[in-house]
Design a protein with these regions (language model features):
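Short, solvent-exposed aromatic-acidic interface loops
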Residues: 55-59, 109-112
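Short helix-to-loop capping/linker segments positioned immediately adjacent to catalytic or ligand/cofactor-binding
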Residues: 25-29, 77, 123-129
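Charged, gly/pro-rich active-site loop segments
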Residues: 82-154
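Amphipathic alpha-helical interface surfaces
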Residues: 14, 59-62, 101-105
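Active-site-adjacent structural patch at catalytic or cofactor/ligand-binding sites
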Residues: 55, 67-76, 85-94
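Short beta-strand segments
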Residues: 21-57, 74
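Extreme N-terminal tail/first-helix region
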Residues: 1-19
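A generic structural signal for nonpolar/aromatic side chains embedded in well-ordered alpha-helices
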Residues: 18, 65-66, 109
Length: 154
């Protein structure tokens, strides 16, 4: 069996990788309990920030975990031609509003704002969503961003 290693990704490689991905895993915590959920996202390298559109259906635990989490971890991983790549982003999640509130966040000069970027988050329907489902926009201001790519044999 061939031994493979991993190499760190630089900022440009991390940004390039995240631009080609649309789903990752958001890990949250409340006390001693953890909660991880696959979510669609968009990445703003200027922050850097990661934006999510989350569905808070009745009985969903995401809202309580977002509210309780002081520091979240978001992981994006994929098999590429070069081998496995992964990026880990960490930060304190914050609510940005509901999808209906987007117009209140637009830049006065009409330039692309974080709210516009949030619109680019794809909707993924995992369940038949009840009519009372509320979608919320969540921002993860990234204070730690790392990435690795699988390297060739030693």
């Amino acid at each position: 069996m061939t031994q493979r290693t991993a190499e760190a990704l630089d900022d440009a490689a991390i940004e390039s990788f995240l631009e080609t991905q649309s789903v990752g895993t958001l890990s949250l915590a409340k006390g001693n309990e953890s909660y991880a959920v696959p979510v669609a996202f968009t990445f703003d390298p200027d922050g850097p920030d990661v934006y999510f559109r989350l569905g808070y259906a009745p009985g969903s635990r995401k809202r309580e975990f977002i509210d309780a989490t002081e520091r979240a971890t978001f992981v994006v991983a994929a098999q590429t031609e070069a081998g496995w790549k992964s990026v880990i982003a960490r930060g304190a999640p914050e609510h940005r509003g509901t999808v209906e509130d987007l117009n209140t966040h637009r830049s006065a000069d009409g330039s692309m704002s974080p709210a516009d970027r949030e619109l680019a988050i794809p909707f993924y329907h995992v369940f038949d969503a009840p009519a009372e489902t509320v979608f919320a926009l969540v921002r993860l201001p990234v204070d730690e961003l790392t990435g690795v790519v699988e390297a060739g044999p030693n």
